């Protein structure tokens, strides 16, 4: 019934389109010179009252009253009321206006005034049809409520839900602020390949494509890391890249197969430098994008002001779970502790992996305020440098906000012999069925053998940062066109 009603409305609009064309009116016009936005007219009303302005946008409401009518026009910044009188525009333009529908795009010229009810408006003197809309907007001006439809047809979401548009405006401010922060600190923005002969830099399942001319399979990148480290070898001491990453994995409120990652690397630094850099950058970005370092996310008040608390992984487990893994030196000891928590631990799992399983189950949900978790097990950190005092752990941290990982950073492993051993261990896990284990990357190892300076490196999930700063519960709310299951016919 809904589809039939929509088809009926489209038929009416098509008939209006034909009438306009027969009358010699172009329904899909050309350029229109805009002098002011709706926001500028509101903010500068005292200056503009009585002055002629030109603005363009989409009609979201039409109220006809005989020889005078009102309409609401929405442009990129907001809405403004239009007032159209037959006496002002003449019968030709007024007849055109009466053939318009909600959703049509128009350009108008007229004088700024305030109605008797106090509404800032434009008294239209000229009107140009710029685009005839053939489909009716959903639920008129009451908003698009179907969440699935919002994601599939984001253009409609942006039209009828102004708060959604604001999320993506804020996202652009966040990305601009990140670039400004890094550029001002001497980092060089670079671009590295999206298609890789070997998938590496993260534990993830890649997408595979085929290059016809070379007749080889290639992988869409799952990380930026290994190419950026090659640039450290080449002498570019402070580099960053912000780009799309592709991981052939599940979809959830926290995960989209295609997402935006920032990775940066600084020669002669370590993970302590990366901690300082991250907390300074997040606070800077929040101030630039929002004007504050205190935000609310899903009811929680988050203070992004540095310094952030720092705990080792073992300290965090002891704090939130009450178990001291320093007193559980063997994998079997760790396994029993994990099983007592109700976790399913595979036979033969390494102690470091068990510790991480316990951490994810017992600690992560508690990390609401910005927190650094330091010193991850070497078993899950194949690209991070080992701690000298405890080689079972690495100089690696993850930063958490609102119970979710925001960033991952290392003191980078630059020992090519140790790196080869790590890759060999990963290959053994891959042979045992772990599809997310690292592949052997001989070209990267060769680069390390020329010598890479000690460095700190970091990866930051841009979408998750935007989620926090815009109070968005799902990653789909901050990606313009998220990945969706094909629509059933």
Curated annotation (Swiss-Prot):
Mg(2+) 1 binds at residues 398, 405. SUPFAM superfamilies: Class II aaRS and biotin synthetases (SSF55681), Nucleic acid-binding proteins (SSF50249). Gene3D superfamilies: Bira Bifunctional Protein, Domain 2, Nucleic acid-binding proteins. It is an enzyme of class 6 (ligase). Keywords: Aminoacyl-tRNA synthetase, ATP-binding, Cytoplasm, Ligase, Magnesium, Metal-binding, Nucleotide-binding, Protein biosynthesis. Its cofactor is Mg(2+). InterPro entries: Aa-tRNA-synt_II, aa-tRNA-synth_II, aa-tRNA-synth_II/BPL/LPL, Lys-tRNA-ligase_II, Lys-tRNA-ligase_II_bac/euk, Lys-tRNA-ligase_II_N, Lys-tRNA-synth_II_C, NA-bd_OB-fold. Its EC number is 6.1.1.6. One of its GO terms (molecular function) is transferase activity. It is found in: Cytoplasm. It catalyses: tRNA(Lys) + L-lysine + ATP = L-lysyl-tRNA(Lys) + AMP + diphosphate. Binds 3 Mg(2+) ions per subunit. This is Lysine--tRNA ligase. It comes from Moorella thermoacetica (strain ATCC 39073 / JCM 9320). The gene is lysS.
């Amino acid at each position: 019934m809904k589809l039939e009603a929509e088809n009926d409305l489209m038929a009416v609009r098509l008939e209006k389109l034909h009438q306009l064309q027969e009358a010699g009116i172009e329904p899909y016009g050309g350029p229109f010179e805009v002098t002011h936005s709706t926001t500028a007219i509101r903010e500068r009303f005292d200056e503009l009252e009585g002055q002629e302005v030109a603005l363009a946008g989409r009609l979201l409401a039409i109220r006809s009253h005989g020889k005078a009518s009102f309409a609401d026009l929405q442009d990129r910044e907001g809405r403004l009321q239009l007032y159209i009188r037959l006496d002002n525009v003449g019968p030709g333009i007024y007849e055109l206006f009466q053939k318009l529908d909600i959703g049509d795009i128009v350009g108008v010229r007229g004088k700024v005034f305030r109605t008797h009810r106090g509404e800032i408006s434009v008294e239209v003197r000229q009107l140009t049809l710029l685009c005839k809309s053939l489909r009716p907007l959903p639920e008129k001006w009451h908003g698009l409520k179907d969440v699935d439809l919002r994601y599939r047809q984001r253009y409609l979401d942006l039209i009828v839900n102004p708060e959604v548009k604001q999320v993506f405006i804020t996202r652009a401010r966040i990305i601009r602020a990140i670039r400004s922060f890094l550029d001002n600190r001497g980092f060089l923005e670079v671009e590295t390949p999206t298609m890789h002969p070997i998938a590496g830099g993260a534990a993830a399942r890649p997408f595979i494509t085929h290059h016809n001319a070379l007749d080889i399979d290639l992988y869409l990148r799952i990380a930026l890391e290994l190419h950026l480290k090659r640039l450290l070898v080449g002498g570019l001491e402070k580099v960053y890249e912000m780009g799309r990453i592709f991981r052939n994995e599940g979809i959830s409120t926290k995960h989209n197969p295609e997402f935006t990652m920032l990775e940066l690397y600084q020669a002669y630094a370590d993970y302590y430098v990366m901690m300082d850099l991250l907390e300074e950058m997040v606070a800077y970005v929040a101030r630039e994008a929002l004007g504050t370092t205190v935000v609310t996310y899903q009811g929680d008040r988050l203070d992004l002001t540095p310094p952030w608390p720092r705990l080792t992984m073992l300290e965090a487990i002891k704090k939130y779970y009450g178990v001291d893994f320093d007193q559980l030196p063997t994998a079997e000891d760790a396994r029993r502790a994990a099983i007592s928590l109700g976790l399913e631990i595979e036979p033969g799992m390494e102690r470091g992996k068990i510790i991480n399983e316990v951490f994810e189950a017992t600690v992560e949900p508690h990390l609401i305020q910005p927190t650094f978790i330091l010193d991850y097990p070497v078993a899950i950190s194949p690209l991070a440098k080992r701690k000298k005092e405890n080689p079972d752990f690495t100089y690696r941290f993850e930063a958490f906000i609102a119970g979710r990982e925001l960033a991952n950073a290392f003191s980078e492993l630059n020992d090519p012999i140790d790196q080869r051993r790590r890759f060999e261990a990963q290959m053994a896990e891959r042979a045992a069925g772990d599809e997310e284990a690292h592949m052997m990357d001989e070209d990267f190892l060769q680069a390390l053998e020329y010598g890479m300076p000690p460095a700190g490196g970091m990866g930051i999930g841009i979408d998750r940062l935007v989620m926090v700063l815009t109070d968005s519960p799902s990653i789909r709310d901050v990606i313009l066109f998220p990945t969706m299951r094909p629509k059933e016919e």
